[in-house]
Design a protein with these regions (language model features):
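Short, intrinsically disordered, mixed-charge
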Residues: 71-79, 133, 149, 187, ...
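A conserved amphipathic terminal alpha-helix motif
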Residues: 161-207
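Secondary-structure transition/turn motif
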Residues: 104-107, 131-133, 157-161, 217
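Hydrophobic-ligand binding "helix-grip"
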Residues: 107-148
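Beta-strand/loop substructures that line and gate deep hydrophobic ligand-binding cavities in soluble
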Residues: 133-177
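Hydrophobic ligand-binding cavity/cleft-lining segments
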Residues: 1-107, 219-222, 226-251
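Short hydrophobic/aromatic-rich beta-strand segments that constitute the beta-sheet cores
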Residues: 102, 125-129, 153-155
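Short, highly charged C-terminal tails/helix-capping segments
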Residues: 190-233
């Protein structure tokens, strides 16, 4: 079966839709949260069960060198994200050790403002690690390889929920949402190249135990800190809105 579309397809469920916030407000919130000062956290720093997840999509029907796939993925990384999840800036703009701000859709129509840190990048792959406050502690490796003339794009991650609160969220549907997030991302990546393909997913629990010594990570919980920062900003934003409306009435 030829999986190629008749013409290049633009993903319809990508990171393109507006998150509902102006970029300036997003970066202001990131500064208030001190996102750029948060240290990276590996799987050993988290609280919850340890999971290895591998998502793959076979790009059948197109001659795509792995280097081209990764170069495209780096340039348009956030554009392949589903829903209103946002990644601010291409991977190509980051140097190893630098953080990119991200907004992640959460239950109850809320948004988690956090980030990811670039660890390394090569022509055929790149690795990100989560900072303190992120819902997960661990790393994610994005790669492309070729076997028997078929190029495969992959996301492999080794992760734990960072604290007890986020672990509860992952158990109550968070893992399902995250798996679908990366599957849809790979569908969108394939569609960018005009290929309709269904990803494969393999999930393995590497360690079923909780790391109770890291329960204190809840102090850095990004959802709690996001809520406090947004609550503190309400009076100023209400004042700004009032001034704008007064200015509109007098103009």
């Amino acid at each position: 079966m030829d999986n190629r579309a008749h013409s290049p397809i633009t993903p319809t469920d990508s990171g393109k839709p507006d998150s509902g916030k102006p970029d300036a407000e997003v970066f202001e919130e990131a500064d208030a949260l001190d996102l750029h000062d948060q240290r990276p956290t590996g799987p050993e720093d988290g609280f919850g069960k340890l999971w290895r997840k591998i998502h793959r999509v076979h790009l059948i029907g197109a001659d795509l060198p792995p280097e081209h796939v990764i170069a495209t993925w780096k340039r348009h990384f956030g554009e392949f994200w589903p829903g209103k999840n946002r990644f601010y800036g291409p991977i190509t703009a980051l140097e190893p050790g630098e953080l990119a701000v991200i907004n992640i859709e959460m239950p109850a129509a809320t948004t988690l403002s956090t980030g990811v840190i670039l660890v390394d990048a090569t022509p055929t792959g790149f690795t990100l690690i989560t900072p303190e406050g992120h819902m997960l502690s661990g790393w994610l490796h994005f790669s492309a390889d070729r076997d028997d003339a078929i190029t495969t794009a992959s996301v492999e991650m080794l992760i734990r929920a960072s604290d007890p609160l986020f672990e509860i969220g992952m158990v109550l549907g968070g893992h399902h949402r995250e798996n679908e997030f990366w599957d849809q991302t790979l569908r969108n990546l394939a569609l960018h190249f005009g290929i309709a393909a269904e990803p494969e997913t393999k999930v393995t629990c590497e360690d079923p135990h909780y790391q109770w010594e890291n329960a204190k990570n809840i102090w850095h919980n990004g959802a709690i800190r996001n809520g406090l920062v947004r609550l503190a900003a309400l009076p100023r934003r209400a004042s700004d809105l009032l001034h704008r409306r007064r200015a509109e009435r007098t103009s």
